[in-house]
Design a protein with these regions (language model features):
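N-terminal periplasmic/intermembrane-space "pro-region" immediately following the signal or transit peptide
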Residues: 1-77, 84
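Short, structured coil/loop segments at alpha-helix boundaries
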Residues: 3, 34-39, 112, 233, ...
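Outer-membrane beta-barrel pore domains
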Residues: 9-15, 79-95, 129-135, 148, ...
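Outer membrane beta-barrel
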Residues: 15-18, 69, 75-78, 94-204, ...
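Charged interaction patches that mediate protein-protein contacts
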Residues: 50-73, 226, 231, 235-243, ...
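Short, low-complexity, polar/charged sequence segments that are solvent-exposed and flexible
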Residues: 93, 173-177, 208-209, 342-346
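Outer-membrane pore/translocation modules
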Residues: 198-228, 238-260, 265
Length: 373
């Protein structure tokens, strides 16, 4: 039970202090499966060295308080994007080539047993290889507090926000506001806040009608959303939700309405540990014909996506890899800021096939290639 000094010796010919003896007793107290006789001896020793054990505990606690309670993670990312667009006016193709470099830091600060503070700090640079222009930005992309009480999670501040029911098809970006998620196996999500449209690129459109701007909303809009979905780790996943974005002045001018209401649903199935299939659908309501947009076709009011996944590269596992193939139709008015825009090449108002391949050539390094047509 008594381990001595850890080097195989007990140094019986040397005197030890009561604190050294208390350390040995503390190690003995932490052991399990000791006999009744040994347990009685340990209890007597603990009573004898109670003051030293107490003082030793105070010293350890004091050291723990001095340990930095902020943990840092981060990444460095390079992207090359080649985008070829048909110019319908002169029947020519326009090629755009962009280099993007991103340095990201993500600190997490422990506040107490229930709350932590989180942030995401981005420093990025983008070079347009066609025009020679260069853009550099440094932003605090997220800053918020997160509370956990049992199976309830609360996020408040400039938070990450993803529509889980449809695997991020409607939205996967950020919002200034709050979100509460209840439950474990089946979850209920309630979210509300404000969306900075100029940065968020809400309802991204390429201008489907004469007179439209590149992005429908330029001012801050209010957002409310509710979703019910099951745990994403289950074999069969499902979810449904309702999202509302409201901006009276601009929406009134664009389509003679004051808000866009989006109903979203998603289904997924894991055939095995390596193969899974997901699908999602969203429909926008509350939109009228009129205003700058004129008559709005149904294709702009609904979105759908389906994707087949095989494995997936993991940064912690060198040599791991994965692939996917999917088809998406993203209506401008039924996607707020889709995950296929945030992590892929697709904007609102576009549809097509996408394939991708990911690979981890070494630990903590992942490469990914995506092609869309």
């Amino acid at each position: 039970v008594i381990e001595g000094y850890g080097d195989g010796t007990y140094r019986g010919d040397q005197e030890i202090t009561r604190y050294e003896m208390a350390q040995m007793v503390a190690r003995a107290m932490a052991k399990s499966g000791v006999s009744g006789a040994d347990k009685a001896m340990i209890d007597r020793l603990a009573a004898e060295f109670a003051d030293e054990l107490n003082n030793l505990g105070v010293r350890v606690a004091a050291l723990e308080k001095k340990v930095d309670n902020v943990k840092w993670t981060g990444r460095v990312r390079y992207r090359y994007i080649h985008r070829s667009e048909d110019n319908m006016s002169d029947h020519e193709k326009e090629n755009k080539n962009t280099n993007q470099v991103l340095f990201r830091l993500e600190p997490t600060a422990r506040i107490n047993e229930n709350w932590v503070g989180k942030a995401r700090i981005d420093y990025g640079q983008a070079d347009n290889m066609n025009t020679g222009s260069n853009e550099t930005s440094a932003t605090v992309d997220r800053i918020y507090v997160e509370g956990t009480y049992g199976t309830t999670k609360i996020d408040l501040g400039k938070i990450p926000f993803k529509t889980q029911a449809d695997y991020g098809m409607v939205s996967d970006y950020r919002m200034a506001g709050g979100q509460v998620v209840f439950g474990k196996d089946v979850k209920l999500s309630l979210a509300a806040g404000r969306i900075n449209d100029d940065n968020y690129k809400v309802f991204a459109t390429g201008g489907t009608n004469a007179g439209t701007t590149d992005y429908i909303l330029k001012k801050t809009a209010s957002y409310q959303g509710v979703e019910v979905y099951n745990d994403r780790a289950q074999k069969f996943t499902w979810g449904l939700g309702f999202q509302r974005v409201k901006q009276e002045a601009e929406m009134k001018a664009l389509f003679d309405g004051t808000e866009v209401n989006i109903w979203n649903v998603g289904l997924g199935y894991k055939f095995s540990q390596d193969v899974s299939l997901t699908g999602a659908y969203a429909q926008a309501t509350g939109i009228n014909d009129g205003g700058i947009l004129g008559k709005i076709d149904s294709k702009h009011k609904h979105s759908y996506a389906v994707q087949l996944n095989y494995k997936g590269a993991k940064a912690s596992q060198m040599g791991s890899w994965g692939a996917f193939v999917g088809y998406r139709h993203l209506g401008e008015l039924s996607t707020i800021h889709s995950t296929y825009r945030e992590f892929g090449p697709m904007n609102g108002g576009e549809k097509g096939w996408e394939v991708g391949l990911s690979w981890a050539p070494m630990k903590n390094v992942v490469g990914k290639v995506q092609y869309y047509w």
